[in-house]
Amino acid sequence: MPNGRRVANMAALLRENPNHHGPIRQADCSACHNPHASPLPNLLTETYPPLFYAPFNADNYKLCFTCHRSELVSAKDGRGVTGFRNGDLNLHYVHVSQPSKGRTCRACHAVHASKSPAHISEVVPYGNWKYQIKFEAKENGGACAPACHAARSYERTGEAPTAGPAGPAQPAE
């Protein structure tokens, strides 16, 4: 590519990561990419934050919201919205909706395919570093222990006990 970046070997990526994102399962790359005329980075059809941190603004996530409901990240109460919640606290909201250092989807999710059914990446990209996420799915929730915070767990009913010295994640008020 003119900017020096290489295009990913999608055949290998998809072969090694059996849980494919919806458009990949439908063999519809054009749901997200316009290979002939997009002015956006990575030939995307709509906006998607290119960095790890970004202030939350729904306009920055137009690509995601063409398929996913915006409440996935904008609703503080996660019941009926997401399985990624601690009791009723929507943990997508906690991570993404921060006014200055919201984590973008890429902080935890692999956009094309992953080994995890929830498209959880194995590593968190942070600058030139990659940290293991150490995600563990559990019957009523899950746990992770990336370098960005202490080990934490969550439960969809009730609340998970504090899993690290920093305590459970809380949204910025």
Tell me what each language-model feature is.
Residues M1-E173:
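Flexible linker/context regions in extracytoplasmic redox proteins
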